[in-house]
Amino acid sequence: MKKILFVLFACLCVMTACTSQKETRTRAEQIREQLLTCDENSVIVVAHRADWRNFPENSLEAVQSAIDMGVDMLELDVQRTKDGVLMLMHDHNLDRTTTGTGNIADTNWEDIVKLNLKDHQGNVTVYKVPTLEDVLLMCKDKIMINLDKADRYFDEVFSLLEKTGTTNLIVMKGGQPAKEVKEKFGKYLEKVIYMPVVNVDKPESEQAIQNFLEELKPVAFELCWNNPESQVPAKMAKDLKGRSLIWYNTLWNWLCAGHHDDLALEDPDGTYGFMIDSLGARILQTDRPQMMIEYLRSRNLHE
């Protein structure tokens, strides 16, 4: 009897220690570990340009809103001003999303900071264009960030990551071949996660994936496909299981063979569920993060 009680007590101590360890890790560290360990027990939700339905895309307010709703990762776009300030904006010019005009690369930061952001319907708001540093400090310890368009000046981006202590937040991605990625970003890959983007409609896609597995062993692949007849996505679900997580985008038809967010309004099982159950998706980038999180929680696939 004493032996049984001792074993039970030891098990309780181990469970308590594990729980305590998880609680001491930041939210960002927990998500990063999920990536690094290829954890398939839940689905990572990525908010495309943050919560742009409620606030201007790539704004601090959209970022904070996404954090508050429980998003795991943000997809944010980086541009550089004429005087070298790294800032958030998708387009290379100011016209669509601000009250200004002209190319960002031809405009100094002191002029951009005077502008107001527009929402997705073109209405002028009170919100301002953020710098990348502003966003990194806001996100620190709270959420992962997928930086898009940042590879063009990644030396400068990395310096900013080190300055703010946020190298562990970042997922970089791109469509370059494995050897080129290794040559270009090799010195950063121990600190920053790199994820290849592969269009599986292309005949060379399977070889490209194999090259990455041999050269870099990426924690995840972003797969894009537009051909609903293709068997490659289902094959990748089997081939990559236990090796790399699979990321799919539910943004537009041509990225996901029609299994997009707006279709999920009526049929979440046929869109999100299909990608999770049939294609092995464990990372989903969405324009409807709140709806996706609610669906995943109903299936115990998200906290």
Question: For each of these PLM feature ranges, what is it?
Answer:
Residues C18-E303:
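Phosphate-group recognition and catalysis centered on beta-loop-alpha active-site segments
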Residues M1-R27:
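Bacterial Sec-dependent N-terminal signal peptides
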